Amino acid sequence: MGKKYVIGIDYGTESGRAVLVDLEGNEIADHVTPYPHGVIDEVLPESNVQLEPDWALQHPADYIEVLATAVPTVLQKSGVNPADVIGVGIDFTSCTMLPVDASGEPLCLKPEFRNRPHSWVKLWKHHAAQDEANLLNEIAAKRGEAFLPRYGGKISSEWMIAKIWQILNEDPEIYEQTDLFLEATDWVIFKMTGNIVRNSCAAGYKSIWHKQDGYPSKEFFRALDPRLEHLTETKLRGPIVPLGTRAGVLTNEMAAMMGLLPGTAVAVGNVDAHAAVPGVGVVEPGKLVMAMGTSICHMLLGTEEKYVEGMCGVVEDGIIPGYFGYEAGQSAVGDIFAWYVEQGVPAYVKEAAEKEGVSVHEWLEKRAAAYRPGETGLLALDWWNGNRSVLVDTDLTGLIVGYTLLTKPEEIYRALLEATAFGTRKIIDAFVENGVKVDELYACGGLPQKNKLLMQIYADVTNREIKIAASKQTPAVGAAMFAAVAAGKENGGYESIVEAARNMGKVREETFKPIPENVAMYEQLYQEYTKLHDYFGRGENDVMKRLKHWKETARAAKESMTLS
């Protein structure tokens, strides 16, 4: 048997990346395909239908474009014979979901529904189902639902049930016309194989499914809304299978489009951050993996089910079979830095960066690195896109304390970096206080590769060593590992994800170690962060929510005047 390869495809927020990997984890070729429609958050494509605040949609055709462009490109770049590619795996942002008809066609592609916002793909960061999430949590708490503590006491507006309920409330016809609500990752697998299978990772973390208990009861769904009583056996029906399972094989049509052979094994879908865990070679407890990009997802393995405040979920076999997989997260990290560079930086900074031939981020990072902890006089709460863990509240907003007339852009930049590190520390503390150990940190994604200052701050704030993934495409490599498992040993792949990760997972030799004097100062700053966190985040002062409410009321009044 000659040398064999697998392909992993990582569907992110703005683009899809395909990576061709050999069975030792060496990346042979990769290609990024930007989504032609990007994130749809203002106006629906091909129409003037305006979207409300907090909406975030996508176009499902963009996902197929990734298969049609990125996969043939990596084959061409590498010169690898398609016959030597034994499997394909994908991972996806989640919960990114869409309604489809009985043939599996997205409703937004049907002319009669094109101008209806609820027919489109709802991206993970669609936050317009907050009212539904609030009511769901209230009803679940009143009923004493057993599932609630597994999700840190709150179900997020980003997840499947809240999004489905929003569709039912705001466009019941779209709900009625929907045969299935699918995670986008499961829909792409359906397009490749012709088989509808739901992966246990997304079902467990985003759809309130439990390996032992299944979905919540019909009585619970009836308590939410009588029309939802039969949701799980109708519009959420379909087999739920473990990660690494073979979903099927490439159809003739998709094989031709992708430049691969019909019959190539396809692994069930996965969630982007979770695929990164084996991608860095982590297959045992005590090692927290941070998938760092626009947001951060924190993942950890444990040997028993513990309840942790504000965690996104604990799912048996949710990340690595045989362990309980814990997930927590921050709703915005890279997005905050990008917002500041785009919206908050004065013209002289942009001009200076251009003159030096560096990006604005690099210019700011270089100058911010000259400051000691505490020297900026600033402290921020990292809630620009709400708070995922531990407060689970998308109505919270950002805050910076300590501005003066002498405050510089690089000081603000550093304060924002530090704020996101404090947010991660808050999550680590929650795990440790509830008996889930965190001994060391692993970081992957775009940010750790680009920003050394950020990683040193994280090491200092958490007082833990951080190892960095060798790959820039860790989730895609993780997806490729699951492809090797789906292909099976008999075809040159692996028997289990543990075996695949031990052979294919890689980290850099360079690590970030805490600097003792920085740790001491950051401990003091963290205590102040905690006071602000609890004051604004736990109900003592709801000014952020009032401001957001007044903003939305004023905006709605202005729009109604424009329409009249």
From Swiss-Prot:
A biological process term (GO) from this entry: L-arabinose catabolic process to xylulose 5-phosphate
Substrates-to-products reaction catalysed: D-ribulose + ATP = D-ribulose 5-phosphate + ADP + H(+); L-ribulose + ATP = L-ribulose 5-phosphate + ADP + H(+)
Transmembrane segment boundaries: none
Transferase is among the record's keywords: yes
Pathway info: Carbohydrate degradation; L-arabinose degradation via L-ribulose; D-xylulose 5-phosphate from L-arabinose (bacterial route): step 2/3
Molecular function GO labels: ATP binding; D-ribulokinase activity; ribulokinase activity
Enzyme Commission designation: 2.7.1.16
Gene3D superfamilies membership: 3.30.420.40
One GO CC term on file: cytoplasm
Pfam families for the chain: FGGY_C (PF02782), FGGY_N (PF00370)
Record bears the keyword Kinase: yes
Keyword line: Arabinose catabolism, ATP-binding, Carbohydrate metabolism, Kinase, Nucleotide-binding, Transferase
EC main group: transferase
Highest taxon of the lineage: Bacteria
Family from the record: Belongs to the ribulokinase family.
Listed name of the protein: Ribulokinase
UniProt source species: Geobacillus kaustophilus (strain HTA426)
Gene label: araB
